[in-house]
């Protein structure tokens, strides 16, 4: 388990007010920030911190889920895309986001255009 601490009192003055992530499973300490003596991201054995007093620091740990979420934001009206399918000559510069890439709507196949419309506009969340 990883916990965050700020050292408030220590025999080693370099540790004073430094912030650390303690990994109890590996018995390691990772420096988040220190004014002297330690570098950010430096990993040492937890025992090297010596005796100290500390306060807990809230930490946020990023989820380790593969895949995650992806959001493409297109700010436009459904009618605009539907009209672009019917009259592509009126929308030569219409650009949308698809899978993280900017693409001209007219360069997509009709099937892809309809898929974009279906996925972009929903009745409710």
Curated annotation (Swiss-Prot):
Q: Which InterPro entries match?
A: Auton_GlycylRad_Cofactor, Form_AcTrfase_GR_CS, Gly_radical, Glycyl_radical_cofactor_GrcA
Q: What is this protein called?
A: Autonomous glycyl radical cofactor
List, alphabetically, the Pfam families matched: Gly_radical (PF01228)
Query: Which residues are recorded as modified (Glycine radical)?
Result: 100
Q: Recorded GO terms, molecular function? A: formate C-acetyltransferase activity
Tell me where in this chain the Glycine radical domain is found: 5-125
- Which PROSITE patterns does its entry note? GLY_RADICAL_1, GLY_RADICAL_2
Instruction: Write down the superkingdom of origin.
Output: Bacteria
Q: Which GO terms describe its cellular component?
A: cytosol
**Keyword terms, alphabetized:** Organic radical
Any idea what job this protein has? Answer: Acts as a radical domain for damaged PFL and possibly other radical proteins.
